[in-house]
């Protein structure tokens, strides 16, 4: 609006949505090995990438009930190595029981 009086021409009727700005910082720093040398920085980047690869993820495990042979599903949050260990256990001596068979 310009001036002391309101004019219809001064009123803006078209609203333009503002784009959302992501203010999240996705940077992760390793403070224990923080050093200004370039070699240490490249090592830190490699270590950080290795840590991110080993971070926990959500996995769904399906196995048969040892009593009624129905499918039992587990959702686990674990590293890839630990999921492999669970897989080896389920292929060996460990068996899962479904909810219905467990209540008898």
UniProtKB/Swiss-Prot annotation:
GO terms for biological process: DNA-templated transcription; symbiont-mediated perturbation of host cell cycle G1/S transition checkpoint; symbiont-mediated suppression of host innate immune response; symbiont-mediated suppression of host type I interferon-mediated signaling pathway. Its main location: host cell. It is found in: Host cytoplasm; Host nucleus. It comes from the Viruses. A zinc finger (unnamed) spans 65-101. Residues 1-47 are annotated as: E7 terminal domain. A motif (LXCXE motif) lies at residues 23-27. A motif (Nuclear export signal) lies at residues 83-91. One of its GO terms (cellular component) is host cell cytoplasm. Pfam families: E7 (PF00527). Belongs to the papillomaviridae E7 protein family. The E7 terminal domain is an intrinsically disordered domain, whose flexibility and conformational transitions confer target adaptability to the oncoprotein. It allows adaptation to a variety of protein targets and exposes the PEST degradation sequence that regulates its turnover in the cell. Homodimer. Homooligomer. Interacts with host RB1; this interaction induces dissociation of RB1-E2F1 complex thereby disrupting RB1 activity. Interacts with host EP300; this interaction represses EP300 transcriptional activity. Interacts with protein E2; this interaction inhibits E7 oncogenic activity. Interacts with host TMEM173/STING; this interaction impairs the ability of TMEM173/STING to sense cytosolic DNA and promote the production of type I interferon (IFN-alpha and IFN-beta). This is Protein E7. The gene is E7.
